């Protein structure tokens, strides 16, 4: 899966290009992001293009969260479509992973993290 990777200061911003995050691409999504993280432990997933996510896609997001959490960091989501947000809320992912309306809000939320 193609993922646009950008740095904003010490925050890695990853934007999945595909409209679906599911069984067909979740492993490559997870691999690309974890490979790009390096020593970075602040991750924003910009979900602006994602229209659908299934359990494997949620698992990939959780895997990325575990990876950054193990390094003392965090993962934030932004620009999540209503259908995707419903799935994330159904599995209660929004309780362990903050969701922001915009990329800037998500990036700014890291200001208090070392």
Report each predicted region and the residues it spans.
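Residues that form or immediately flank small-molecule/cofactor binding pockets and catalytic motifs
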Residues: 8-10, 82, 104
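Amphipathic alpha-helical interaction surfaces in cytosolic regulatory modules
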Residues: 23-97
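STAS-typified acidic loop motif
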Residues: 2-31
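A charged, well-structured terminal subsegment
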Residues: 99-114
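Short, charge-rich amphipathic segments
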Residues: 1, 37-38, 43, 102-106
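General small-molecule cofactor/ligand-binding pocket signal
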Residues: 4-6, 78, 100
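Non-catalytic signal-transmission and effector/linker regions of two-component phosphorelay proteins
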Residues: 1-4, 112-114
């Amino acid at each position: 899966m193609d993922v646009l990777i950008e740095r904003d200061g010490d925050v890695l911003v990853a934007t999945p290009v595909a409209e679906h995050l599911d069984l067909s691409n979740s492993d490559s999504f997870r691999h690309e992001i974890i490979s790009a993280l390096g020593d970075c432990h602040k991750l924003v997933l910009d979900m602006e293009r994602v229209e659908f996510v299934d359990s494997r896609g949620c698992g990939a997001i959780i895997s990325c969260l575990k990876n950054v959490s193990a390094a003392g960091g965090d993962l934030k989501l932004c620009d999540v479509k209503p259908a995707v947000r419903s799935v994330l809320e159904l599995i209660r992912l929004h309780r362990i992973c903050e969701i922001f309306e915009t990329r800037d809000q998500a990036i700014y939320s890291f200001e208090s993290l070392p």
